[in-house]
Structures are given as structure tokens and as C-alpha cells.
């Protein structure tokens, strides 16, 4: 957040005074990082990361034959709700959400704050019209997409597999790196990375199931492209803006 967008300068001043000398230095460095990232970003297409699946890498997918009936029933129930446009957040709040959501919308308050403005210029702590960024972040953690991918793998559901992949593509198209409210928290970016690992592994394992026909090449190519869109930008962001010092995270 740049100085012009600070909601209460006195709060930041008092917090700055309570920081250690080393944390103050790092906060200043982070401030200038934000200025730099406002002007220019790396070309994430020029990454040097190895992104193809490796044997023994995280996550390790258990055998679908070992899944208990209780899990199958729960996955079927959750998948049906998600496909019908109902998503549960914070374990108890049910939201009606489009199949391809507005990723910067608080669906509980009905407030859409979609923007392509640089995240360095956004104050996520104070949204207009009673909106809460936590409702935006929760949907963009992709937890419901992990659930779809789990159901696809355990119950051999081709449609859930494809929808999970399509929704990640949709998120990427509407949340370009360092633009909008979903790029204001490195912690949220880290949670997305973890969930993406599961989505990738589960959908790839689903495609390899002979009962669905040979879809390994088609899905493998789609995921290969998706990794290039998701991983470099998120890894860079999470590391560059990692929590330190007195941060609650």
C-alpha cells in the first residue's frame, strides 16, 4: 500500500515505532519494492523453472481404491453443490456463485470490486459498500476446485476434472500478476500454490484412468500450459512479499 492510500497514517506510524531496527529496514525496502513493481514486472514467460511432474514429488496421490464410502458420498454431495453454484466458505457460510465466478466479488455482501489497478495501489483493508476482502480471498484459494478435482479422481468424473482446470484458466485471465485484490497478500498466493499442486496432480491422475478413455495427452498439454501461467508469477510473488518481523502471518 502506498502512502496516498493509507487509511490511518497514525496507525502505521505507531506500528513503525514498535518495530525492531531490522524490521524497519525491511519495511522500507518493501515499500520501494512496491514502487518498483508498480512501474515494471518481470517477464514471467522467461522463467527457468522445471515444471513437469516428477516421480515422488509432492503431492503423492493415494489409490482411489482405498477411498472409504463415506468419503465418496461426501465428495459426491460437495461436487453436486459446487456444480449447482453453491460454495461453502469458512466451513459454514453458503454462497451462490456462478460457474465462472467474479473473482474479485464479495458474494456475501454482493459487492464486486473487480479492478485491474496495481495491487500496490489498493487498500484491501477497506473495501467500498461493506465488502470484505476475506470473502474474495477465500474463493480465490481454490479450495472448492480441489474438492472438484478430488471427486473427479475418486469417482472417475470427467466433467469435474475439466471444470476444475477451466476455472483455474478463468482465474488467470481475470487476475493478471500484481493487479487486483487477489495480489495484495503473499499468504493467499501461497495457499493458492498449495491448492494448485493438488488440482494439477489429481486432474492428471484422473486423465490417466483408462475407464475415461485416453485423455492423458490432452489434459497433460492443458496442464503444461496452465503451470506456465500460474507457477512463475505466484512463486515470485510469494517469495518477494513473504511475511517477516511483526507480521501476523
Predicted regions and their residues:
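Hydrophobic, aliphatic-enriched repeat segments that assemble into extended interaction scaffolds
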Residues: 2, 65, 69-72, 190-197
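Extended, charge-enriched "interface" segments that sit outside catalytic cores
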Residues: 33-127, 134-138
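Membrane-proximal basic amphipathic "stem/tether" segments
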Residues: 1-56
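Aromatic-lined, polymer-binding surfaces characteristic
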Residues: 113-117, 126, 132-249
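Preference for short coil/turn "hinge" residues that link or interrupt alpha-helices
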Residues: 2, 9-12, 75, 96, ...
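Intrinsic-disorder/low-complexity regions
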Residues: 4, 77-79, 248
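Generic detection of long, well-ordered alpha-helical segments
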Residues: 6, 18, 22-25, 61, ...
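Short secondary-structure junctions and interdomain/linker hinges
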Residues: 19, 23, 35, 39-42, ...
